[in-house]
Amino acid sequence: MHTENTIYMRGPKSRIFQLAADIQDWPALLPHYREVIVFEQSDSGDRKVVEMAAERADFPLPGLKFPVRWHSVQVCEPDAGRIYFKHTAGVATGMWVVWSLEDDPWGRGVKVTIAHDLTYPFGFLNGWFARNMVGDQFVHAIAGRTLRTLKQVVERDGLRSYK
């Protein structure tokens, strides 16, 4: 399963990166994140072992919220504009996630992409279940809401000068 979400944000790349990297603050920033527990953190803060809990809105029916929870290792590379996650527990165990931040040469802002890749060790899970249920219904939906909300925060806070 591979899925990508991309959005352009008008704000300083360093500020966008910081908001994305500071996952322990996400529950206060992102209404669909219920909890982030940091189990371990490197002295630099560039590596964290965490448990994250979010909710998928309007699933399985409009108005309902479906809770999801997973463990992950996060590694940040600020100079490269990359944040990596490896899911270590939960329904998407083994999933790799890469956040990429790039300046847009056309002046649309900072291009922020979240890519998810998951291959289950049991092949029968890699078809419809991985693609439609995990990928489309949860991963893509939650990542899209995360990016849209971060964009609102960055641009609402008056962080419009991004160079």
Label each region the model flagged.
Residues M1-K48:
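Hydrophobic ligand-binding cavity/cleft-lining segments
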Residues M1-T6, V49, R69-H71, R82, ...:
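Intrinsic-disorder/low-complexity, polar/charged segments enriched in Ser/Thr/Lys/Arg/Asp/Glu/Gln
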Residues N5-I7, V36-F39, R69-C76, H87, ...:
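Hydrophobic/aromatic beta-strand elements that line small-molecule binding cavities or substrate pockets
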Residues G11-K13, A54-P60, Q74-P78, A89-T93, ...:
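Beta-strand elements of well-folded, non-transmembrane domains
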Residues P12-Q18, F138, I142, T146:
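Short amphipathic alpha-helical segments
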Residues R15-A20, W26, Q74, V112-I114, ...:
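Hydrophobic pocket/interface hotspot
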Residues V38-A89, G144-K163:
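Glycine-rich portal/gate segments that line the openings of hydrophobic small-molecule binding cavities
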Residues Y84-G144, S161-Y162:
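Beta-strand/loop substructures that line and gate deep hydrophobic ligand-binding cavities in soluble
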